[in-house]
Regions:
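Family-specific signature for flavin-dependent thymidylate synthase
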Residues: 2-260
C-alpha cells in the first residue's frame, strides 16, 4: 500500500515543464500540383490530345502549352471554364479529370475531427499524423469550443470545467509515463497506454493529401452548408480557402464549376 500511495503522489504532482496550450484548429496548404488547365487536358485526353507536339523544356509549362495547342485546333472545343463546368454539372458528373491535381495540407486538429476525417478514405488519399505511441506529446495542445461562451454563466462554467479537466488529464498523462517507467514498464508501453488520459479535444499535427475531386467530395459532405459538426466543417472550409488563396488562382474555374 505504501508503494501505491507514493505512486499516487507522483501522479498528482504538477508537471510545470509541460506547456498546456489552447489552440484553434488550423490548416495550411503545404504544396500543390495542377490547376484548371491540367483538369482540361485530362478531359481532352479521350478526344483531342496529341502527344506528338513539341513541348517546352520547362516541364511546369507543358500543361499550359498542351492547353493552348488543343484549343488552337479549333474543332468546336469548349473553353476551359465551359469544359470544367460541363464536367462538374453533367448528369452523371464526369469528375475523373479533377483527380489529376493534388493538394498536401498540414493541420493541427483535435482528435474528434481527426477521427471524422479518417472515415473519408476515398476523398483523402493519404494521412500521416503524430503518434502518442511513438513519442510523448510534450506540447499538450488542446481545443476548447468557444461557442460555449455564448451561453451565459452555464456555458462559461462548463468551458472552464473542460479546460481544467483537460489540464488534469495532461498532468496524469505525463505522470503516468514517468511513474510506470520508474516502476519498470517499457517506455513504449507507458507512452501508448498513458495516452488514454488524453481527451477528444487533444490536438495533434497531421499531413493529408488529396486530389481536387477529393477536396470537393469532402466539401460537399462536410462543409459549413452541411449538417456536419462545427469543428470539421471549419477545417474543411479552411482547406478550400487555402486553395482559393493560391497566388494566381490556378483553380478559379474548377472551384466555380462546383459552385464553390
Amino acid at each position: 500500500m505504501g508503494n501505491n500511495r507514493a505512486s499516487g503522489a507522483a501522479i498528482a504532482a504538477p508537471f510545470s515543464y509541460h506547456q498546456n496550450s489552447t489552440m484553434e484548429n488550423s490548416v495550411v496548404l503545404i504544396d500543390y500540383m495542377g490547376g484548371d488547365n491540367l483538369h482540361a487536358v485530362n478531359a481532352w485526353a479521350s478526344t483531342f490530345l496529341e502527344l506528338g507536339l513539341e513541348l517546352p523544356d520547362d516541364i511546369h509549362a507543358r500543361t499550359d502549352a498542351l492547353t493552348d495547342a488543343i484549343q488552337a485546333q479549333g474543332k468546336r472545343k469548349r473553353s476551359v471554364p465551359d469544359l470544367l463546368n460541363y464536367l462538374a454539372n453533367s448528369t452523371p458528373a464526369h469528375t475523373s479529370p479533377f483527380r489529376a491535381s493534388k493538394f498536401i495540407f498540414g493541420m493541427t486538429i483535435e482528435t474528434a475531427t481527426h477521427i471524422q476525417l479518417l472515415t473519408h478514405t476515398v476523398a483523402i488519399e493519404h494521412t500521416n499524423a503524430e503518434s502518442a505511441r511513438y513519442k510523448e506529446l510534450m506540447e499538450d495542445k488542446y481545443y476548447l469550443p468557444a461557442d460555449w461562451l455564448n451561453y451565459g454563466i452555464r456555458g462559461k462554467a462548463f468551458y472552464e470545467a473542460l479546460e481544467e479537466h483537460t489540464k488534469r488529464g495532461n498532468e496524469l498523462y505525463h505522470g503516468a509515463i514517468a511513474a510506470l517507467v520508474d516502476a519498470g514498464m517499457s517506455k513504449q508501453r507507458a507512452k501508448e497506454s498513458a495516452r488514454f488520459f488524453k481527451g477528444y479535444n487533444s490536438q495533434l499535427n497531421a499531413v493529408r493529401s488529396m486530389s481536387f475531386d477529393g477536396l470537393m467530395q469532402l466539401y460537399q459532405k462536410r462543409g459549413e452548408h452541411s449538417p456536419s459538426q462545427r469543428e470539421i466543417a471549419g477545417v474543411v472550409e479552411a482547406m478550400v480557402q487555402a486553395v482559393r488563396d493560391i497566388p494566381g488562382n490556378p483553380f478559379k474555374h474548377s472551384l466555380a464549376a462546383f459552385g464553390v
